[in-house]
Curated annotation (Swiss-Prot):
Pfam family for this entry, one: UPF0060
Transmembrane segments: 4-24, 29-49, 55-75, 84-104
Stated family: Belongs to the UPF0060 family.
This protein's name: UPF0060 membrane protein ZMO1566
Positions in coiled-coil regions: none
Membrane topology term: Multi-pass membrane protein
Domain of life: Bacteria
Record-linked PANTHER family: UPF0060 MEMBRANE PROTEIN YNFA (PTHR36116:SF1)
Compartments (UniProt record): Cell inner membrane
Species classification: Bacteria, Pseudomonadati, Pseudomonadota, Alphaproteobacteria, Sphingomonadales
Length: 107
């Protein structure tokens, strides 16, 4: 269920941020910012539905998913596949996100 929230949130954030990248770094039209801003608003709204107990933890857990989605974006949209170090680093981040989300708080 969590993937149904965090994956669309990541796509919305990456799309929104990429619109600024495209405008500034790739010299695209400033009109790219209009859907980009809408995407960033969607991202912020989606994260408010996180099951985490507070915003900071929601963002921390989301960060692991964001890293995976960013690597997929780089691969599929920008034609730059991840190398083994990218994948190892992403795996560590997912483990960290899982610990933050699911480990008992009584320790």
């Amino acid at each position: 269920m969590l993937a149904l929230l965090y994956i669309p949130a990541a796509l919305a954030e990456i799309t929104g941020c990429f619109s600024f990248w495209a405008w500034i770094r790739l010299h695209k039209s400033p009109l790219w910012l209009l859907p980009g801003i809408a995407s960033l608003l969607l991202f912020a709204w989606l994260l408010t539905f996180s099951p985490a107990e507070n915003a900071g933890k929601a963002y921390a857990v989301y960060g692991g998913i964001y890293i995976i989605m960013s690597l997929l974006w780089s691969w599929k949209v920008e034609a730059t596949p991840p190398d083994h170090w990218d994948l190892i680093g992403a795996a560590f981040c997912l483990v960290g996100a899982a610990i933050i989300l699911w480990m008992p708080r009584s320790l």
